């Protein structure tokens, strides 16, 4: 089975967490002889080819990061230029990733994605949701492989089922809400560790001041 994958991430492929997830997913999907083609909307030179692939194929997966509780603007712009299909048979599925540990943070976007295929003349193939992936591109290789391994498994699953069944993706998404006890533990012990971790990341990115610095405070009345 041939699968067209369209990445709706705004970051270039080399810097994109979504691209890393797509790579892991493809590995599992292609194990039994399936084929995939991937188009990255961060590269606008690929838009015409991506639109043509959408038009000519019947098995499509859009992978995207969560942006302000919904889809990235670059993906919305691309979708607005597509012509709805007039011939039935195309299945449109989604892979939604974000940095929040609770699956509930993605439900608003999921609701939008559920109605989107109908507007494009397609049937809905389900949405695979996974959060707590903010540090995916910042971890070491071994930890990154550990985080990506479940996506390879879901690639195998998708190759067999052809869609994301609700029960399977609900288990994959993780906790809908973090337990109160876990939140308290994080506030007590996790935040100091997080500050150290984010401080190291900021230095790698070229920051020379504290993350809580307020350089414009003196100008605010």
Regions found by a protein language model. Give the residues of each.
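Alpha-helix capping at helix-to-loop junctions
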Residues: 84-87, 119-122, 160
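Short flexible/disordered coil segments
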Residues: 96-109, 124, 153-165, 188-208
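Active-site oxyanion/phosphate-handling segment shared across diverse enzymes
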Residues: 135-179
């Amino acid at each position: 089975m041939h699968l067209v994958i369209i990445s709706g991430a705004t970051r270039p492929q080399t810097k994109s967490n979504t691209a890393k997830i797509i790579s892991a997913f493809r590995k599992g999907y292609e194990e039994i002889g399936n084929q995939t083609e991937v188009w990255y909307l961060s590269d606008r030179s690929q838009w015409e080819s991506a639109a043509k692939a959408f038009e000519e194929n019947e098995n499509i997966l859009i992978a995207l990061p969560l942006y302000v509780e919904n889809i990235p603007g670059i993906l919305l712009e691309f979708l607005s230029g597509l012509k709805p299909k007039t011939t039935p048979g195309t299945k449109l599925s989604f892979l939604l990733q974000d940095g929040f540990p609770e699956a509930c943070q993605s439900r608003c976007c999921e609701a939008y994605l559920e109605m989107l295929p109908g507007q494009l003349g397609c049937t809905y193939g389900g949405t695979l949701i996974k959060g707590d992936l903010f540090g995916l591109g910042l971890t070491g290789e071994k930890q990154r492989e550990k985080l990506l391994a479940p996506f390879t498994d879901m690639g195998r699953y998708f190759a067999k089922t052809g869609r994301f069944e609700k029960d399977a993706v609900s288990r994959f998404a993780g906790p809908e809400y973090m337990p109160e006890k876990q939140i308290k533990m994080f506030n007590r012990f996790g935040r100091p560790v997080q500050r150290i971790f984010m401080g190291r990341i900021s230095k790698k990115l070229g920051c020379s001041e504290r993350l809580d610095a307020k350089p414009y405070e003196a100008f605010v009345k």
